[in-house]
């Protein structure tokens, strides 16, 4: 099978990217604000709402993020239209034919517009790799479900020029999911 390779390109030294990464509309809504390679803010919304596994991003968390800095770019942790394709295939019509779970619509309440949508498993791979001390590694991502993928294996390497390659070596797609089986057994 042919898998996609993703490459990050470093910006010139005088350009410090300011990125707000958001995850919401499912369990564990969270955010991370990066200025260059420095984490300015990282948090889960359940710390603000006192609701375990809270799926909603709330104004108190957004206000707290703004105290730590601004951003030039907003990334969302999955590709919503790809996810809707899987939901349509699975017969989850109420999820497919609503706009409330589209990030572009959902984030209007905070006056935020997503600039970039990242594949769900690539989001996991990047988060695990960039918070590790390694310059080369294999990443194994297993969860209930991303857009379609339920498990992926990546070869990840940062090169001398500062670029990082994420090469997907294997993936398993819905409905086959170790994570969904785990959720069914643990009722989580």
Task: Give a label for each model feature.
Residues 1-188:
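Short acidic/glycine-rich loops and adjacent helix/strand connectors
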């Amino acid at each position: 099978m042919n898998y996609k390779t993703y490459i990050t390109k470093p910006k010139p030294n005088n350009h410090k990217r300011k990125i707000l990464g958001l995850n919401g509309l499912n369990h564990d809504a969270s955010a991370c604000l990066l200025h260059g390679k420095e984490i300015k803010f990282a948090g889960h919304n359940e710390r603000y709402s006192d609701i375990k596994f809270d799926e909603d991003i709330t104004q108190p968390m957004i206000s707290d993020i703004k105290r730590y800095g601004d951003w030039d770019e907003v990334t969302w942790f999955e590709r919503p239209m790809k996810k809707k394709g899987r939901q349509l295939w699975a017969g989850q019509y109420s999820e497919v034919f609503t706009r409330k779970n589209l990030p572009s619509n959902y984030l209007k309440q905070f006056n935020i517009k997503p600039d970039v949508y990242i594949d769900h498993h690539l989001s996991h791979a990047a988060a695990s790799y960039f918070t590790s001390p390694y310059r080369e590694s294999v990443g194994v991502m297993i969860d209930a479900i991303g857009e379609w993928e339920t498990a992926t294996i990546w070869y990840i390497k940062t090169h001398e020029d500062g670029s990082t390659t994420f090469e997907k070596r294997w993936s398993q797609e819905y409905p086959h999911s170790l994570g969904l089986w785990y959720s069914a057994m643990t009722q989580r």
